[in-house]
């Protein structure tokens, strides 16, 4: 059986971009904030498109006429998949849509925290999760010459160049970044996979070596328990949080203790948002023509401004150039300041939503072209390994 999406009623989260691919399918559309999407709001809706702040479960969907529900996000921890399937609905997500953006966020965080030099000099990076984001981050780091160790019991085959280890071993590395998907499925449930015991292991490992440690969570807040986070905040670890236990609420004492914080925007580049919409459009098209509506692969993003002229510092060495390039493209200082400007008493859900809605989405730089005033072979090499293209003024003469 086929359906015509333009003949159906849609309800769409107000932050989902109406890209040309998605707009071409839309019929009668209602737009509203994600937290305002209720059972009453969807009672006469056929297609429901949400983001991560809207729980989609039997309580929401039962009694509605929803036929298709999609999330424009990579993660599906806000979906009760069993309940959706039990109701006989078709659903889809956008895995990988935000991967490039999160990779860029983590790389710039290494520069902002002054850990970039250490990892380029041999300090290993431990990754928890090697899916769409973790796998791409590992590949990028390896191209830069960084030693990468990872834990992910669900990845097969194992990616070349990544040291395979158990969770406890990965958590003993000086730099740790979380990228596991959040789920409760046995035997490798990831919710609170880092509890207070694991955090204490991290602190003990840090105490046995010179220097501190860097912990980044740009994945899901509930991958760790509140107690585990508190253990780290009370230690010498430098903590960077884009997401945290109990999100969206952020207690004032946590805000006072964390080193760097941003309001869950690591994956929110302009291109990531567009990819999410385009992937949903592809799934809706397949569903409407009677095909399986499994999530599609990330599509090519819309054109964005060239980076030419934004990276012309060639007087320094390649390592200094790399550091400066990443600092120039970091959103972390700006976002940390925005969060703290809301008040050190902490954040409410309304505060959190306001910060995200006013986020100035950056353009991704991966795959873009930069211009060097004078072509330097070492800088060209490190830029290429970072993931950008290089041109020089001498090529235009």
Residue ranges of predicted features:
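N-terminal glycine-/charge-rich "phosphate-binding" loop or analogous flexible N-terminal tail
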Residues: 1-45
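Phosphate-coordination loops involved in phosphoryl transfer and adenosine-cofactor binding
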Residues: 7, 121-124, 196, 212
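Glycine-rich adenosine-cofactor-binding loop
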Residues: 14, 95, 103, 121-142
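A short, aliphatic-rich alpha-helical micro-motif
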Residues: 42-43, 61-63, 169-173, 255
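Phosphate/diphosphate ligand-binding glycine-rich loop within oxidoreductases
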Residues: 46-118
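Rossmann-like adenosine-cofactor binding region
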Residues: 56-57, 155-252
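NAD(P)-binding Rossmann-fold cofactor-contacting core
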Residues: 143-160
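Rossmann-like dinucleotide-binding domain for NAD(H)/NADP(H)
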Residues: 205, 212-390
């Amino acid at each position: 059986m086929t359906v015509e999406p333009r003949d159906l009623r849609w309800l769409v989260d107000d932050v989902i971009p109406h890209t040309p691919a998605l707009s071409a399918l839309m019929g009668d559309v209602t737009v509203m904030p994600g937290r305002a999407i209720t059972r009453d709001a969807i009672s006469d809706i056929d297609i429901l498109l949400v983001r991560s702040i809207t729980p989609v479960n039997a309580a929401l969907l039962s009694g509605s006429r929803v036929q298709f529900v999609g999330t424009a996000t990579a993660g599906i921890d806000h979906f009760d998949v069993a309940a959706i399937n039990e109701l006989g609905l078709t659903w889809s997500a956008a895995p990988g849509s935000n991967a490039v953006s999160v990779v860029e966020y983590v790389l710039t965080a290494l520069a902002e925290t002054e850990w970039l030099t250490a990892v380029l000099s041999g300090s290993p990076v431990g990754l928890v999760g090697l899916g769409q984001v973790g796998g791409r981050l590992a590949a990028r780091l390896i191209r830069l010459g960084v030693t990468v160790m990872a834990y992910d019991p669900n990845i097969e085959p194992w990616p070349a160049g990544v040291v395979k280890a158990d969770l406890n071993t990965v958590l003993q590395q000086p730099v740790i970044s979380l990228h596991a998907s959040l789920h409760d499925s046995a035997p490798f449930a990831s919710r609170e996979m880092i509890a207070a015991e694991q955090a204490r292991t991290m602190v003990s490992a840090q105490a046995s070596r010179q220097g501190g440690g860097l912990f980044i969570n740009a994945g899901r807040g509930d991958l760790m328990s509140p107690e585990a986070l508190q253990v780290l905040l009370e230690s010498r670890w430098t903590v960077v949080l884009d997401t945290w236990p109990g999100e969206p609420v952020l207690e004032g004492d946590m805000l006072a203790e964390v080193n760097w914080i941003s309001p869950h925007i690591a994956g929110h580049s302009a291109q990531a948002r567009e990819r999410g919409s385009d992937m949903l459009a592809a799934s809706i098209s397949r569903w409407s023509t009677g095909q399986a509506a499994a999530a599609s692969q990330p599509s090519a993003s819309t054109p964005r401004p060239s980076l030419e002229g934004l990276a012309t510092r060639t007087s320094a060495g390649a390592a200094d150039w790399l550091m400066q390039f990443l600092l120039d493209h970091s959103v972390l200082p700006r976002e940390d300041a925005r969060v703290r400007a809301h008040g050190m008493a902490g954040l409410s859900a309304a505060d959190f939503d306001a910060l995200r809605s006013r986020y100035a989405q950056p353009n991704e730089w991966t795959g873009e072209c930069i211009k060097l005033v004078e072509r330097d072979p070492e800088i060209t090499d490190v830029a290429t390994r970072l993931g950008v293209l290089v041109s020089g003024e001498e090529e235009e003469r």
